[in-house]
């Protein structure tokens, strides 16, 4: 009887650990957005190699070269506030995108045509544009960078 209870408890423990463990190291969509798109401290104005450095530092050149990425150089609170601004349709057809009401300081990184992994080489373009981001969750936070216009 004691062995049977122990076996049942052990089985339940294995089941629970198998369900919980895969989610432990998983990056949330909001955290991924921050890692891939937020750079409140920096700016590309002073460095033509900004994108090469940032894409590597933010782990977007691991296994392959991410072809395009945009960094936003504004406070996170300002970017999060876009989630309550003008709603627009996302490129994928969903209706959870929002367009910034004002232009923001951004840097576009584009993989150069001749660049091949593992030597990812990017062009760096600094600009002021409106951004379109997808927001989800409770609280409603940025989870995807859709476009700059």
Curated annotation (Swiss-Prot):
GO CC, alphabetical: extracellular region
First and last residue of the signal peptide: 1-25
GO molecular function: lyase activity; nucleic acid binding; ribonuclease A activity
Catalysed reactions listed for this entry: an [RNA] containing cytidine + H2O = an [RNA]-3'-cytidine-3'-phosphate + a 5'-hydroxy-ribonucleotide-3'-[RNA]; an [RNA] containing uridine + H2O = an [RNA]-3'-uridine-3'-phosphate + a 5'-hydroxy-ribonucleotide-3'-[RNA]
Family matches, as Pfam families: RnaseA
Positions annotated to bind substrate: 32, 35, 66-70, 91, 110
Stretches for region Disordered: 30-49
Major location (coarse): secreted
Keywords, comma-separated and alphabetical: Disulfide bond, Endonuclease, Hydrolase, Lyase, Nuclease, Secreted, Signal
Function: Endonuclease that catalyzes the cleavage of RNA on the 3' side of pyrimidine nucleotides. Acts on single-stranded and double-stranded RNA.
Oligomeric form and interacting partners: Monomer.
Name assigned to this protein: Ribonuclease pancreatic alpha-type
Natural source organism: Rattus exulans
